[in-house]
């Protein structure tokens, strides 16, 4: 991931977008777990 030094100024926005994407996936996963536990109960 950190192969390229600070060459492209687009590396930071891409990393921010990737981080937000992973946060969104984590949020969906947690919500899915909560819903599944509610449905199981």
Swiss-Prot record:
GO BP annotation list: photosynthesis
* Compartment(s) of residence: Cellular thylakoid membrane
Concerning InterPro entries, the annotation shows: PSII_PsbL, PSII_PsbL_sf
Its Gene Ontology cellular component terms are: photosystem II reaction center; plasma membrane-derived thylakoid membrane
Protein origin, superkingdom: Bacteria
The keyword Iron is assigned to this record = no
Main localisation? membrane
Keyword tags: Membrane, Photosynthesis, Photosystem II, Reaction center, Thylakoid, Transmembrane, Transmembrane helix
Give the membrane topology, semicolon-separated if more than one: Single-pass membrane protein
Query: Is-annotated flag, keyword Transmembrane helix?
Result: yes
Q: Which residues are listed as membrane-spanning?
A: 20-40
For this protein, the record's NCBIfam families field holds: PRK00753.1
Q: What does this protein do?
A: One of the components of the core complex of photosystem II (PSII). PSII is a light-driven water:plastoquinone oxidoreductase that uses light energy to abstract electrons from H(2)O, generating O(2) and a proton gradient subsequently used for ATP formation. It consists of a core antenna complex that captures photons, and an electron transfer chain that converts photonic excitation into a charge separation. This subunit is found at the monomer-monomer interface and is required for correct PSII assembly and/or dimerization.
What does the record note on quaternary structure? PSII is composed of 1 copy each of membrane proteins PsbA, PsbB, PsbC, PsbD, PsbE, PsbF, PsbH, PsbI, PsbJ, PsbK, PsbL, PsbM, PsbT, PsbX, PsbY, PsbZ, Psb30/Ycf12, peripheral proteins PsbO, CyanoQ (PsbQ), PsbU, PsbV and a large number of cofactors. It forms dimeric complexes.
- Name of the featured protein: Photosystem II reaction center protein L
Species of the source: Synechococcus sp. (strain JA-3-3Ab) (Cyanobacteria bacterium Yellowstone A-Prime)
